[in-house]
């Protein structure tokens, strides 16, 4: 009798103990990914980020290169460019005692002489007797010689058998540019005064005007 009671008490005590909860079972439709799948996904994301950063960096590099010269100059090329820049013409300049106007230099003689000797003097200076281009140039020359009460030989004479006024460069006088006053005959040469272009004997003594083209004056190394 006592033994039965003890057995019953032990049975009740065991059945009253709390039961451990088991984890909920997954439904058959749920897919549980293995751990290496998750690791592969993380690595893929990291690679994608690195790829995007690489593309951005490459784009910046390309833009930087495009802003630079395609070919870098060698030291020899740099020196050559400096030499060209230094030796480049800086201005147009006439010789001393010559006067510049437009693209010409003019020289006025100080002592009178015949037309032929005046022509030879200009040739010795590497120039020619004056060849008047237009009325504007004639006005400049009259201002240049203003105050000198003399006429000035120019490179124009009367030629036979053509019976024409010709410049020493063989071109014929344009009467719209100059009108000649005075007798026109053999051995006639032209001179300019403050108000006229005169026909005179080539053996007369006059001052004269030489002309030459402007030349480039270069500023070179060591000058």
UniProtKB/Swiss-Prot annotation:
Residue intervals of the C-type lectin domain: 101-211
Major place of residence: membrane
Cysteines engaged in disulfide bonds, as pairs: 122-210, 189-202
Domain of life from the UniProt record: Eukaryota
GO molecular function, one term: signaling receptor activity
Described function: Receptor for CLEC2D/OCIL. Ligand-binding contributes to inhibition of cytotoxic natural killer (NK) cells. May mediate MHC class I-independent 'missing-self' recognition of allografts, tumor cells and virus-infected cells.
Identification of the protein by name: Killer cell lectin-like receptor subfamily B member 1B allele B
Organism for this UniProt entry: Rattus norvegicus
Gene behind this protein: Klrb1b
